[in-house]
Amino acid sequence: MKRKLIYIFSCWLSSIILFVACDDMEDKPFTSGIIGDPTETGTAELYVLCEGLFNQNNSSLARFSFGNQQMVRDYFKAVNRRGLGDTANDMAIYGSKIYVIVNISSTVEVIDFRTGSSLKQIQMLAENGSSRQPRYIAFHKEKAYVCSYDGTVARIDTTSLSIEAITSVGRNPDGICVQNEKLYISNSGGLDYSSGLGVDNTVSCLLYTSPSPRDRQKS
């Protein structure tokens, strides 16, 4: 079971530290009114993403406020009155939003970091309705890019929160980053390794110019 932590200094996001841990968290006494309280936006906060158990639909997002020393273990559920989904795999902040990649549920949960409220649950589904199984997210110039195990990268507009374009890459991509106006996607081939194809030891490079990514390369 994996947890990802994001440490935020104030609403201006002047510093962010991400790390992974597997230590248990103890529940703290809940104080009414702290959830989504906009008066806390000037304090430091810690967000903890727990992917939960595979196929158990028990992913969670916890929040710790350093200002009042309060922990809400399942912060997302407390605010939105529903669970986060099955196997939350990645979390990142861009602008005023938290983006959570929920792998088995095949969704991208977009959350207002000031209030914890869900702004949109983006369904990552293929045309035939099958799950794309999103894995990781990166950002560039008001766009979010999500790589999925079905061998695709989706471009999401961070204002409308709609999927604008989908591009094919290698087998089971399992990492994505931005550098020098390019997207780099590591392809794993991990899901069909036993079929005799072996690993996919390639990196896809996408040159993204308006209106959509193009010129896919492998190396």
Ranges and model annotations:
Residues 43-44, 96, 142, 181:
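Short coil/turn segments that connect the beta-strands within blades of beta-propeller domains
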Residues 83-94, 127-139, 170-180, 186-188, ...:
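Beta-rich, blade/repeat-based domains predominating
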Residues 63-132:
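Post-signal peptide N-terminal segment of secreted/secretory-pathway proteins
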Residues 2-5, 15-46:
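Bacterial Sec-dependent N-terminal signal peptides
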Residues 208-217:
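Conserved small/polar residues in nucleotide/adenosyl-binding loops
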Residues 60-62, 107-109, 152-154, 201-204:
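A short loop-to-beta-strand structural motif that recurs across blades of beta-propeller domains
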Residues 44-56, 100-104, 146-150, 185-197:
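Conserved beta-strand positions in repeat-built beta-propeller and related beta-rich domains
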Residues 67, 113-116, 157-161, 207:
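Short loop/turn segments that connect beta-strands within beta-propeller blades
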